[in-house]
Amino acid sequence: MKLSKEISAFCDRIGHRFDRPELLVRALTHASRSTAGRSDNQRLEFLGDRVLGLVMAEALLEADPQAREGQLAPRYNALVRKETCAEVAREIGLGDVLRLGRSEMLTGGRRKDALLGDGMEAVIAAVYRDAGFEAAKALILRLWGKRIGAVEADARDPKTALQEWAQARGLPPPAYIESARSGPDHAPVFTISARLETGACAEAQAGSKRQAEQAAAKALLAQVESNHD
């Protein structure tokens, strides 16, 4: 199978040449594009999630031999969660080569965390199936390397951390309100306000509601923690 120039360039970016290029094509094919004769990337995404998890668990153990399980778990979760996979996918331009159906094309599928994260995991599995575990491990460590060393000991996602902060003080969970939406349908920008019962609030913008909520939660958490220092 001959790959397009765009997908060949993507291979260069991730540093892997496929002996079985059909694996990569499948990894890049979303369910909205699949047909009866051509499968999508869901099965590869399932496998890639497990390969990523094993590599991250081992990398964290090696990076901090003295860390306890309770310290490792939040770091691990921060490294393998869908938002992180989507961030890595954006860094390597994976969205540019995703094979999407018309419905996803019209609704900005190339920018969605869910599609990018799933695609990243599917690409990991494609490398694993093409060249084995060591090749997949090398890819993951190359793409995630800076994150492994920088991940915080308290690496809960901001929404979880903010909710736990509120609960510890007898407050109800924070509310997230979409205050504005701008941009075209294929590239929307969401403005989300995170608010506590105390009246404290913070606002953030992002290309998806999930990203905007996380960013608003992070800003509000920093605000309330600073005020209570």
Curated annotation (Swiss-Prot):
It is an enzyme of class 3 (hydrolase). It holds the Pfam family dsrm. Digests double-stranded RNA. Involved in the processing of primary rRNA transcript to yield the immediate precursors to the large and small rRNAs (23S and 16S). Processes some mRNAs, and tRNAs when they are encoded in the rRNA operon. Processes pre-crRNA and tracrRNA of type II CRISPR loci if present in the organism. Its EC number is 3.1.26.3. Belongs to the ribonuclease III family. The keyword Lipid biosynthesis does not apply. One of its GO terms (biological process) is rRNA processing. GO terms for cellular component: cytoplasm. Homodimer. It catalyses: Endonucleolytic cleavage to 5'-phosphomonoester. Residues 7-132 form the RNase III domain. The keyword rRNA processing applies. This is Ribonuclease 3. The gene is rnc. Keywords: Cytoplasm, Endonuclease, Hydrolase, Magnesium, Metal-binding, mRNA processing, Nuclease, RNA-binding, rRNA processing, rRNA-binding, tRNA processing. InterPro entries: dsRBD_dom, RNase_III, RNase_III_dom, RNase_III_sf. Its cofactor is Mg(2+). The active site is at D49, E121. It is found in: Cytoplasm. Mg(2+) binds at E45, D118, E121. GO terms for molecular function: double-stranded RNA binding; metal ion binding; ribonuclease III activity; rRNA binding. Residues 157-226 form the DRBM domain.
